[in-house]
Amino acid sequence: MLNPIVRKFQYGQHTVAIETGMMARQATAAVMVNMDDTAVFVTVVGQKKVKEGQDFFPLTVNYQERTYAAGRVPGSFFRREGRPGEGETLVARLIDRPLRPLFPDGFLNEVQIVATVVSVNPQVNPDIVAMIGASAVLALSGIPFNGPIGAARVGYINDQYVLNPTSDELKNSRLDLVVSGTAGAVLMVESEADILTEEQMLGAVVFGHEQQQVVIDNINALAAEAGKEKWNWVPESVNQALHDRVAGLAEDRLGDAYRITEKQERYAQVDAIKEEVTAALLEQDEALEEAEIHEILGSLEKKVVRSRVLRGEPRIDGREKDMVRALDVRTGVLPRTHGSALFTRGETQALVTATLGTERDAQIIDELMGERTDRFLLHYNFPPYSVGETGMMGSPKRREIGHGRLAKRGVAAVMPKANEFPYTVRVVSEITESNGSSSMASVCGASLALMDAGVPIKAAVAGIAMGLVKEDDNFVVLSDILGDEDHLGDMDFKVAGSCEGISALQMDIKIEGITREIMQIALNQAKGARLHILSVMEQAINSPRNDISEFAPRIHTIKINPDKIKDVIGKGGSVIRALTEETGTTIEIEDDGTVKIAATDGEKAKHAISRIEEITAEIEVARIYTGKVTRIVDFGAFVAIGGGKEGLVHISQIADKRVEKVADYLQVGQEVSVKVLEIDRQGRVRLSIKEATVGVIVEDTPVAPQSAE
């Protein structure tokens, strides 16, 4: 029989219910988490046995949104969900990051977490719900796990922190921050901010961590009531004798290798040491396992690097703890792009371009929470050659999507509003070299490329990655970390912002015990590094170019009467299609009558504006126009008088005398002067040739509103 167990609690302004025992009973554990009608079903399956030869922890997190959750049918050809979208990939990473460091060292059993959004309230984002569910299933499962974790979203509205703001509240928030951690420590932060101070950001992290304790308490209570028995798992004991033999052969040599400042040379030397030591030990004793030797060598590498840092010795590349690597900043490096920059920091390099497009180039994103349009795109590419490797090239992987989103968060706060700069902007960061913090190099490069393209960003922005090495109460915060320092350290702390404050903060912590003091030191040290980088960037370009590239489309804006929109578009879009083909421009019309004409050639834009003005011009009764005969019928002739308007000259209005046959007086294509007699309620125009007397000013085209570029 089904025996559901439910735990309900208040979480800020929302009510959360966690239910288990009802569904997916063959999974290791399963829960349904409901937060004010946003429901996510989360399962975990852990394999009891380790695959032979497994040398890493195979944790997989799948997050999937079902359109039925929002009462919709998928819009794809097959009418079913396909591969995960970018948003789903980002949420999967959000779930993964705080969970992964809580599995014990040496645990290599395969674990898969699947979170499925099955109901959605547009005001409650399912990401926090999914994170709570993932924490709950692991706590219930009995799988070795040092959790549970909580998760909270923090907004900053009217100078107040807001817990789990609704979608509407977030629109007025200067901050969108997600924080996750255990009862005693923050483990993960992901945020986007509207240039907040270090103190405001740190306060948000602390606030979110304090508020999520209620989640942790309730998950613990549910696990006590319904949790499965803990797995009888113990880590493999360390082979101290083998460890000592490996250390004797390799530790000093690895120490020397880690004094080589050039990355590829250092890696080659480290690999050679590992191969020689492994071969020597296997020659002495064939019963030894190569994987175990490699694991010990890895721990020795970590010990060498970390102990030096903690003793205050120079880092791998000879820098002090708060030094930034050498910078090289160049703009305008590509001749035909709209904006470009090459940003180099040590052995990390990004070639970044900015491209300006029209509104129709904006990305329409159909999400479960609703459809939205994105006018600012930032794409990050990490080819294998950037780290001296070969590999598959293809669609972006999870890491590239995540790094691109972080870089975008860093730049978004300074982007101009649509009414200030009516362009769609796409930034692409090509990582050409990588040795630490390529996402932050992308922020710097994006800022430079945007200014080179003439995009009026509010301020230059830069990013920096901070690291941490901590043993007991001894700790050192490192500025501008290398790839090795990221891998061998305890924290990856990325901060982007302007001279005034922070625009993005991402933090991933591998250990517990990170205090507010450590985070404060890291933020302050990051500020100094950020200001240094900005000062170097300013020497290359200190403000946006005064004009956009000659190769970029120029957008000219005019206003027409909204009632005339249908005339410009035409039946089935016939008129606007003909206009774009005739003028070689791109034309977009908004509901309020705003017309945007984009063209790389000024003359083409003027031609398009002129034609639109003709079409939308108002015809005045009693005014005389010059028109062309378009059709002849028995009862008169139709005359086009500009602006796509056509009127009828009745046979009685052609001449002062009786007209028997219209064709005796008029021919198709003939230019004639006509006077507007009347415009009836249906918009039909009555014209007269005989009343178009000499001496009255003739209008070739109707009067139309002036354009504004």
From Swiss-Prot:
Biological processes per GO annotation = mRNA catabolic process; RNA processing
Which intervals hold domain KH? 553-612
Pull one GO CC term from this UniProt entry: cytosol
Principal localisation: cytoplasm
Q: What is its EC number?
A: 2.7.7.8
Binding-site residues for Mg(2+), renumbered to this chain: 486, 492
Q: By its UniProt entry, which Pfam families does this protein fall under?
A: KH_1, PNPase, RNase_PH, RNase_PH_C, S1
List the Gene Ontology MF annotations in alphabetical order. 3'-5'-RNA exonuclease activity; magnesium ion binding; polyribonucleotide nucleotidyltransferase activity; RNA binding
The record's annotation in HAMAP family points to: PNPase (MF_01595)
Query: What's the name of the protein?
Result: Polyribonucleotide nucleotidyltransferase
Write the lineage as a comma-separated list: Bacteria, Pseudomonadati, Pseudomonadota, Gammaproteobacteria, Enterobacterales
